[in-house]
């Protein structure tokens, strides 16, 4: 499942980070996907609905490409099973965030 998410994240994030022209810009560009990944996976693991996530994303006043990225991250997050206890939930959140950030950084190199 993580491999599928990794490939999905690369495909989703790559167009967003194409404009990054140096290592610092790459890190800055990758912070949005990383933070969004954490937010949507936290809601997923805490029992929030995907529909509510999509409504919240749609209400954000951000660039359309970032809104599209956020929607794709939410769909990917809800493809991961919800965990039954807080430690496993926290691990799933951290893993999803780390994979998103890593894949973004790889896409900018």
Where do the PLM segments sit?
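Compact alpha-helical subdomains of small soluble proteins
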Residues: 48-109
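Sec-dependent signal peptide recognition
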Residues: 1-8
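N-terminal signal peptide c-region/cleavage motif recognized by signal peptidases
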Residues: 14-16
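N-terminal secretory signal peptides
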Residues: 19-57
